[in-house]
């Protein structure tokens, strides 16, 4: 349906809906529920240089309006993804956004250089919420200069467009977004999870083995909307919006805030049909709002 089509750097999308990285595995897990060709794009699970087994359990905890996770970037590593996971997409006609993570800048550069050359990778998503071991564990995405340097280095080696996934756990997300844009990013993805925790009143101990985890789901939607609304008016690159999206109405809100497309995360765990249901319902919302194209809604809430 043409009225749902979105064209972004590296991503020619039949609709503005994709699953968020880390909430859809490598796709095959959800292929048993619906045809993945329905999706606008697929953001796959983070890839690191070496295989990671993740954090100790328990590493997931339910909250009243979402969930906490401290998975620890579990994945088969760069070669495992290239040899085992990416070939599965040969049978699909959907752009693939490959999320990458690392502990050092060199890790990111090596993974981006090789992963971006793979035939099924349409764009790179840079996860800058990871701790930088050479900077005392400070997350790459919390300091504008470091985030910009990482973006510039990855852009220099990537064969495909680069989107940078922003952490909301910062003092000034606009400053970081502008620094990343200046460094050459093709787009942004926001927001990643908010740092949170749960404590078991009976044991008096944190519920997660890692103590703290990323909060996602409906609880963070207002924060995501606010940050996207602020950032989108200060940059000229597209934004993949995410954070608590469950329905087509949520999608409309994110587009009005300034996102160009969206990613569904936690809702995939509670209902594997969330993405196709949203895609089904979007045309009805366009009719209701008397809008011909989904692109007409982008930034519609900005003050003129």
Swiss-Prot record:
<dbReference type="GO" id="GO:0005737">
    <property type="term" value="C:cytoplasm"/>
</dbReference>
<keyword id="KW-0963">Cytoplasm</keyword>
<keyword id="KW-0665">Pyrimidine biosynthesis</keyword>
<dbReference type="GO" id="GO:0006207">
    <property type="term" value="P:'de novo' pyrimidine nucleobase biosynthetic process"/>
</dbReference>
<keyword id="KW-0288">FMN</keyword>
<comment type="pathway">
    <text>Pyrimidine metabolism; UMP biosynthesis via de novo pathway; orotate from (S)-dihydroorotate (NAD(+) route): step 1/1.</text>
</comment>
<protein>
    <recommendedName>
        <fullName>Dihydroorotate dehydrogenase B (NAD(+)), catalytic subunit</fullName>
        <ecNumber>1.3.1.14</ecNumber>
    </recommendedName>
</protein>
<dbReference type="InterPro" id="IPR033888">
    <property type="entry name" value="DHOD_1B"/>
</dbReference>
<feature type="binding site">
    <location>
        <position position="127"/>
    </location>
    <ligand>
        <name>substrate</name>
    </ligand>
</feature>
<feature type="binding site">
    <location>
        <position position="191"/>
    </location>
    <ligand>
        <name>FMN</name>
    </ligand>
</feature>
<feature type="binding site">
    <location>
        <begin position="45"/>
        <end position="46"/>
    </location>
    <ligand>
        <name>FMN</name>
    </ligand>
</feature>
<comment type="function">
    <text>Catalyzes the conversion of dihydroorotate to orotate with NAD(+) as electron acceptor.</text>
</comment>
<feature type="binding site">
    <location>
        <position position="45"/>
    </location>
    <ligand>
        <name>substrate</name>
    </ligand>
</feature>
<dbReference type="InterPro" id="IPR050074">
    <property type="entry name" value="DHO_dehydrogenase"/>
</dbReference>
<dbReference type="InterPro" id="IPR049622">
    <property type="entry name" value="Dihydroorotate_DH_I"/>
</dbReference>
<feature type="active site" description="Nucleophile">
    <location>
        <position position="130"/>
    </location>
</feature>
<dbReference type="GO" id="GO:0004589">
    <property type="term" value="F:dihydroorotate dehydrogenase (NAD+) activity"/>
</dbReference>
<feature type="binding site">
    <location>
        <position position="217"/>
    </location>
    <ligand>
        <name>FMN</name>
    </ligand>
</feature>
<feature type="binding site">
    <location>
        <position position="165"/>
    </location>
    <ligand>
        <name>FMN</name>
    </ligand>
</feature>
<dbReference type="Pfam" id="PF01180">
    <property type="entry name" value="DHO_dh"/>
</dbReference>
<dbReference type="GO" id="GO:0044205">
    <property type="term" value="P:'de novo' UMP biosynthetic process"/>
</dbReference>
<dbReference type="InterPro" id="IPR012135">
    <property type="entry name" value="Dihydroorotate_DH_1_2"/>
</dbReference>
<feature type="binding site">
    <location>
        <begin position="243"/>
        <end position="244"/>
    </location>
    <ligand>
        <name>FMN</name>
    </ligand>
</feature>
<dbReference type="InterPro" id="IPR005720">
    <property type="entry name" value="Dihydroorotate_DH_cat"/>
</dbReference>
<keyword id="KW-0285">Flavoprotein</keyword>
<feature type="binding site">
    <location>
        <position position="21"/>
    </location>
    <ligand>
        <name>FMN</name>
    </ligand>
</feature>
<keyword id="KW-0560">Oxidoreductase</keyword>
<comment type="subunit">
    <text>Heterotetramer of 2 PyrK and 2 PyrD type B subunits.</text>
</comment>
<comment type="similarity">
    <text>Belongs to the dihydroorotate dehydrogenase family. Type 1 subfamily.</text>
</comment>
<dbReference type="InterPro" id="IPR024920">
    <property type="entry name" value="Dihydroorotate_DH_1"/>
</dbReference>
<dbReference type="InterPro" id="IPR001295">
    <property type="entry name" value="Dihydroorotate_DH_CS"/>
</dbReference>
<feature type="binding site">
    <location>
        <position position="99"/>
    </location>
    <ligand>
        <name>FMN</name>
    </ligand>
</feature>
<feature type="binding site">
    <location>
        <begin position="69"/>
        <end position="73"/>
    </location>
    <ligand>
        <name>substrate</name>
    </ligand>
</feature>
<dbReference type="InterPro" id="IPR013785">
    <property type="entry name" value="Aldolase_TIM"/>
</dbReference>
<feature type="binding site">
    <location>
        <begin position="192"/>
        <end position="193"/>
    </location>
    <ligand>
        <name>substrate</name>
    </ligand>
</feature>
<keyword id="KW-0520">NAD</keyword>
<feature type="binding site">
    <location>
        <position position="127"/>
    </location>
    <ligand>
        <name>FMN</name>
    </ligand>
</feature>
<feature type="binding site">
    <location>
        <begin position="265"/>
        <end position="266"/>
    </location>
    <ligand>
        <name>FMN</name>
    </ligand>
</feature>
């Amino acid at each position: 349906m043409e009225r749902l089509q979105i064209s972004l750097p590296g991503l020619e999308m039949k609709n503005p809906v994709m699953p968020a990285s880390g909430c859809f595995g490598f796709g095959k897990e959800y292929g048993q529920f619906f045809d993945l060709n329905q999706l606008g794009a697929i953001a796959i699970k983070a890839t690191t240089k070496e295989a990671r087994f993740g954090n100790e359990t328990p590493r997931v905890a339910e909250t009243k309006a979402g969930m906490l996770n401290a998975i620890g970037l579990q994945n088969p590593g760069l070669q495992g993804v290239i040899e085992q996971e990416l070939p599965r997409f040969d049978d699909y006609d959907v752009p693939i956004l490959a999320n990458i993570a690392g502990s050092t800048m060199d890790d990111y550069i090596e993974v981006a250089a090789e992963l971006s050359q793979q035939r099924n990778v349409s764009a790179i998503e840079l996860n800058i919420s990871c701790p930088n071991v050479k900077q005392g564990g400070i997350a790459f995405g919390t300091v504008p200069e470091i985030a910009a340097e990482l973006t510039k280095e990855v852009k220099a080696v990537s064969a495909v467009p680069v989107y940078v996934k922003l952490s909301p756990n910062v003092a000034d997300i606009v400053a970081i977004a502008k620094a990343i844009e200046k460094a050459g990013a093709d787009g942004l993805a926001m927001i990643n999870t908010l740092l949170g925790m749960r404590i078991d009143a009976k044991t008096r101990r944190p519920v997660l083995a890692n103590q703290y985890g990323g909060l996602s789901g409906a609880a963070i939607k207002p924060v995501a909307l606010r940050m996207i609304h602020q950032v989108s008016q200060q940059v000229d690159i597209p934004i993949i919006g995410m954070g608590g999206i469950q329905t087509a109405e949520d999608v409309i809100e994110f587009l009005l805030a300034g996102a160009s497309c969206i990613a569904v995360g936690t809702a995939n765990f509670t209902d594997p049909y969330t993405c196709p249901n949203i895609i089904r319902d979007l045309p009805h919302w366009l009719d209701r709002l008397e809008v011909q194209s989904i692109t007409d809604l982008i930034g519609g809430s900005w003050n003129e």
